[in-house]
Amino acid sequence: MVKVKSEIDFLKELQETETIKALQENYDFWAFSKIDEHLDNLFIPYFNNAAERRFFPDFIFWLQKGGTQIICFIDPKGSKHTDYEHKADAYKLFKGKVFTPKDNPHFKIQVVLKFYGNKDDVGEKYRDDWIQKDKLKDFFLKLSLIERG
């Protein structure tokens, strides 16, 4: 059960007709799930104060178009953004990279991490890592597949 306001806001926006329409019209396949950090062993490692930590984003999306799949992690944040910088910095290791499974060299996988909420108080360096609340549909419309060079 989802009880955190920022997650509830995200799910409400996801359920809007225009957001669903954007997903259905722009991807051959899409699915999403809430990540449960107590059940799922799905995390992004990062360092904070020289200690290794585990970041469990709240939601994961699988978006496929043709031979490319985007694995998109979205982590809604409330009005007080805390500790996102270290998590965003850890994601930079994957940002812009395209992965190819050994058993299917024509298939491409791209990993995306975004935070969701009001990005007015977010530092300039991290603004591109955020989806502005009430702009989720636009994010899915503008999310581009990286072509392998």
What are the residue ranges of the model-derived segments?
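Electrostatic, structured charged patches in enzyme active sites and in nucleic-acid/phosphate-binding
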Residues: 1-149
